[in-house]
């Protein structure tokens, strides 16, 4: 009898301990999810982030839901984030190397592959800006437009174009999707791999003409080419540079500094966001904090389905597939999204993932 009573006592105590420990963990995670500690540093629950694959798969999950109605800018937090990022990088300076940084014939090491080197060609040097393309520039509102299929049928085109400065990623097509993505492009990125994927590697005159036409639509916009990241895209960069010079295109070319990507990663790691390599979208948001008073994000949705279970394309303009939760991916997009969602809820930025209000 005494043995049975002892077992019951141990069992009861164990259950109580489990119950209180679970409540303590839940409170801690809830606190960490939205906590800004110290002088504005973002802190996220690692356990919540690491289980994001399971979370997003739950039907009707509310983890990533947020409201755009009633959203208000938190100007003091915006200034705090800008100040903190400036401790790691100055986007005005690091957005591009300038002519005085190199001379033709200089040899540099690739940012993500220090064993490999690149020679600074005459064409590349001639296209380097004299001064930073973002020098002394400041905007009231900016749009950073990602390429997720969540934009399709959003009707966000007019809203995106209404911003003072629009940043786009990877030379994404806009004209045929204007109702959803707009057409205004003030700053647009272009990974060298785009040449092969979207323009056939310039194999024929038709491919080259298509590319030239796309760039001609940019006028005086900044074309941001990460030419120094890894070996393999150098010939594409040279082809692009040659076409710009040959056709006297008016785009303003920019090539990010050799320290930029490590500085951006350092900022987020210090703020307890364990990214691998920042995605283009996160990179652009980080840069935009330097010259934008209010940042609006569109086309950010790193999941194969929306919250209603409807399939969402990786890119709104093609059928490319992407494994968001693969450990082989160089990015941690779901983690990045969760971070941006926290910032949205605190008024540091506005994240739009649904339909836009008619203007």
Curated annotation (Swiss-Prot):
<keyword id="KW-0808">Transferase</keyword>
<dbReference type="GO" id="GO:0006486">
    <property type="term" value="P:protein glycosylation"/>
</dbReference>
<comment type="pathway">
    <text>Protein modification; protein glycosylation.</text>
</comment>
<feature type="binding site">
    <location>
        <position position="301"/>
    </location>
    <ligand>
        <name>CMP-N-acetyl-beta-neuraminate</name>
    </ligand>
</feature>
<feature type="glycosylation site" description="N-linked (GlcNAc...) asparagine">
    <location>
        <position position="50"/>
    </location>
</feature>
<keyword id="KW-1133">Transmembrane helix</keyword>
<keyword id="KW-0325">Glycoprotein</keyword>
<dbReference type="GO" id="GO:0003828">
    <property type="term" value="F:alpha-N-acetylneuraminate alpha-2,8-sialyltransferase activity"/>
</dbReference>
<keyword id="KW-0964">Secreted</keyword>
<feature type="glycosylation site" description="N-linked (GlcNAc...) asparagine">
    <location>
        <position position="119"/>
    </location>
</feature>
<keyword id="KW-0812">Transmembrane</keyword>
<feature type="binding site">
    <location>
        <position position="170"/>
    </location>
    <ligand>
        <name>CMP-N-acetyl-beta-neuraminate</name>
    </ligand>
</feature>
<dbReference type="GO" id="GO:0008373">
    <property type="term" value="F:sialyltransferase activity"/>
</dbReference>
<comment type="similarity">
    <text>Belongs to the glycosyltransferase 29 family.</text>
</comment>
<feature type="topological domain" description="Cytoplasmic">
    <location>
        <begin position="1"/>
        <end position="7"/>
    </location>
</feature>
<dbReference type="Pfam" id="PF00777">
    <property type="entry name" value="Glyco_transf_29"/>
</dbReference>
<dbReference type="GO" id="GO:0009311">
    <property type="term" value="P:oligosaccharide metabolic process"/>
</dbReference>
<dbReference type="InterPro" id="IPR001675">
    <property type="entry name" value="Glyco_trans_29"/>
</dbReference>
<feature type="binding site">
    <location>
        <position position="280"/>
    </location>
    <ligand>
        <name>CMP-N-acetyl-beta-neuraminate</name>
    </ligand>
</feature>
<dbReference type="GO" id="GO:0000139">
    <property type="term" value="C:Golgi membrane"/>
</dbReference>
<dbReference type="InterPro" id="IPR012163">
    <property type="entry name" value="Sialyl_trans"/>
</dbReference>
<keyword id="KW-0328">Glycosyltransferase</keyword>
<protein>
    <recommendedName>
        <fullName>CMP-N-acetylneuraminate-poly-alpha-2,8-sialyltransferase</fullName>
        <ecNumber>2.4.3.-</ecNumber>
    </recommendedName>
</protein>
<feature type="transmembrane region" description="Helical; Signal-anchor for type II membrane protein">
    <location>
        <begin position="8"/>
        <end position="20"/>
    </location>
</feature>
<feature type="active site" description="Proton donor/acceptor">
    <location>
        <position position="331"/>
    </location>
</feature>
<feature type="binding site">
    <location>
        <position position="279"/>
    </location>
    <ligand>
        <name>CMP-N-acetyl-beta-neuraminate</name>
    </ligand>
</feature>
<feature type="glycosylation site" description="N-linked (GlcNAc...) asparagine">
    <location>
        <position position="219"/>
    </location>
</feature>
<dbReference type="InterPro" id="IPR038578">
    <property type="entry name" value="GT29-like_sf"/>
</dbReference>
<dbReference type="GO" id="GO:0005576">
    <property type="term" value="C:extracellular region"/>
</dbReference>
<feature type="glycosylation site" description="N-linked (GlcNAc...) asparagine">
    <location>
        <position position="204"/>
    </location>
</feature>
<feature type="disulfide bond">
    <location>
        <begin position="142"/>
        <end position="292"/>
    </location>
</feature>
<feature type="binding site">
    <location>
        <position position="281"/>
    </location>
    <ligand>
        <name>CMP-N-acetyl-beta-neuraminate</name>
    </ligand>
</feature>
<dbReference type="InterPro" id="IPR050943">
    <property type="entry name" value="Glycosyltr_29_Sialyltrsf"/>
</dbReference>
<keyword id="KW-0333">Golgi apparatus</keyword>
<keyword id="KW-1015">Disulfide bond</keyword>
<dbReference type="GO" id="GO:0006491">
    <property type="term" value="P:N-glycan processing"/>
</dbReference>
<feature type="topological domain" description="Lumenal">
    <location>
        <begin position="21"/>
        <end position="359"/>
    </location>
</feature>
<dbReference type="GO" id="GO:0097503">
    <property type="term" value="P:sialylation"/>
</dbReference>
<feature type="glycosylation site" description="N-linked (GlcNAc...) asparagine">
    <location>
        <position position="74"/>
    </location>
</feature>
<comment type="function">
    <text>Catalyzes the transfer of a sialic acid from a CMP-linked sialic acid donor onto a terminal alpha-2,3-, alpha-2,6-, or alpha-2,8-linked sialic acid of an N-linked glycan protein acceptor through alpha-2,8-linkages. Therefore, participates in polysialic acid synthesis on various sialylated N-acetyllactosaminyl oligosaccharides, including NCAM1 N-glycans, FETUB N-glycans and AHSG. It is noteworthy that alpha-2,3-linked sialic acid is apparently a better acceptor than alpha-2,6-linked sialic acid.</text>
</comment>
<feature type="disulfide bond">
    <location>
        <begin position="156"/>
        <end position="356"/>
    </location>
</feature>
<keyword id="KW-0472">Membrane</keyword>
